[in-house]
Amino acid sequence: MAKKILYQDNARKALEKGMDTLVEAVAITLGPKGRNVVLERKFGAPQIINDGVTIAKEIELQDLAENTGVALIRQAASKTNDVAGDGTTTATVLAHAIVKQGLKNVAAGANPITLKKGIQKAVKFVVGKIAEYSKPICSMQDVTHIGSISSGNDVEVGTMIANAIQQVGKEGIISLEEGQSTSTELDIKEGMKFDKGFISPYFVTDTSRMEVIQDNPYILITDKKITLIQQELLPILEKVTKTGRPLLIIAEDIEKEALATIIVNKLRGIINVVAVRAPGFGDRRKLLLEDIAILTSGVVITQDMGLSLDSMSLDQLGSARRVQITKDSTTIVADAQKDLIQARCDQIRRQLEAATNSYAKDKLHERLAKLSGGVAVVKVGAATETEMRDKKLRLEDAINATKAAIEEGIVPGGGSTFVHLSEVLRVWAINNLVEEELVGALIIVDSLLHPLKRIVENAGNNGSIIIEKIKNSNFSTGYNADIGQIVDMYKEGIIDPAKVTRSALQNAASIASMILTTECLIAEQVDN
């Protein structure tokens, strides 16, 4: 297909036009009085949402040159969402403001490369100041405030997230599920859970609930496929039978004949046994089995270590306080040795620092949560499917924002941190930068005012007047758009995670700098 090539101002203008379209759709959701956006669906009900990154992902323009502008600014939102999980609308508004100011200067003859250097220096300075001013989270009340604000001022959600974090710890997993009722509920799963259930329904002990419950069982952990019951399993089964305790077998798989023999012994009441397949695949399976072994104080019977099933002893079996197995999942509640668990968690944290792709990071986070804290499940309740989707997105933002706040602390919310730091940046830039680098830094000074301005305008007031009032007050002062008053943000609980504030600015400036230094745009030529 033929290509359309645009140069200089024409290229930048096309990108700007696309950005204008996207930003207007996203910015109307900003702040406590931000409005909703309805997404039309070819199949199923329309979706009503208030989530910046989801709206940004939906927008596709007919003009492919303008659509490139949409795609670029969408990156600022997506990257912020990946890093901090919230602040996507703020990142979009900031990126747009930087591009708008920057393009005016480029059109007036400024050198985009020097402007970019000024922008980068200014952002580095502001990020340092955000870290300096951020306060660590001191109480569960702070966690509640963060959760409430990020979920659209829903105190009930904030309290629920605070309770979940208190139960599972900051490294625990909080997952979202669609509930069956109209109210949102919190369910805490104790112990380690993995997504493999019993191999055969003949193992079930509670037929009404179709599950297996074992108290104080031994646990045999192996990465082998069990094929020969006489040679491989019989010796250890006899030893376990003498103790009178139940046995859980976690293996790669069990051959039909071996499985049949185990089931017959179970049904005759000779031994209380249940078999499940090992979780995961390949190398990850071995790591998960090692995690289970550490949790249950057992040993993984593997050829790599020179261990075999026929020669194993009771000491090599793990043990647990309680095991609950359904057809889809296994939950092990064990009294593990704290020092061994801590060492394993530290090892996983080091792997997390070195991990590059998001899939590997997610899986490591999952392992860390299972070992260290446990899992909290929030069952989202709503009257309609449309409300359910909106609630899920808000809850997702709230959970991410809360975790970000625990990591890097909190700063005054509602865009007020940016307003206060814009004045600090102005003084620093005038004293430390010259010529076009100074112009680049002053672009950031002006752009930092835009998130608050938009929040105020969405609440139906004059942004410029409020900004002037906040500039002349102390750092914790900001604007409560909900009641339309200037207040102490910490006292009112209007706080943002420092990580979200920082990421929004860094990603916005990164994308905006790239757009400003664009001199040529190549896009598909669309025939009318």
From Swiss-Prot:
The keyword Aminoacyl-tRNA synthetase does not apply. SUPFAM superfamilies: GroEL apical domain-like, GroEL equatorial domain-like, GroEL-intermediate domain like. Its main location: plastid. It is found in: Plastid, Chloroplast. InterPro entries: Chaperonin_Cpn60_CS (IPR018370), Cpn60/GroEL (IPR001844), Cpn60/GroEL/TCP-1 (IPR002423), GroEL-like_apical_dom_sf (IPR027409), GROEL-like_equatorial_sf (IPR027413), TCP-1-like_intermed_sf (IPR027410). GO terms for cellular component: chloroplast. GO terms for molecular function: ATP binding; ATP-dependent protein folding chaperone; isomerase activity; unfolded protein binding. Its EC number is 5.6.1.7. It catalyses: ATP + H2O + a folded polypeptide = ADP + phosphate + an unfolded polypeptide. It holds the Pfam family Cpn60_TCP1. ATP binds at T29, L30, G31, P32, D86, G87, T88, T89, T90, G414, D496. GO terms for biological process: protein refolding. Keywords: ATP-binding, Chaperone, Chloroplast, Isomerase, Nucleotide-binding, Plastid. Together with its co-chaperonin GroES, plays an essential role in assisting protein folding. The GroEL-GroES system forms a nano-cage that allows encapsulation of the non-native substrate proteins and provides a physical environment optimized to promote and accelerate protein folding. HAMAP family: CH60 (MF_00600). Forms a cylinder of 14 subunits composed of two heptameric rings stacked back-to-back. Interacts with the co-chaperonin GroES. Belongs to the chaperonin (HSP60) family. This is Chaperonin GroEL, chloroplastic. It comes from Gracilaria tenuistipitata var. liui. The gene is groEL.
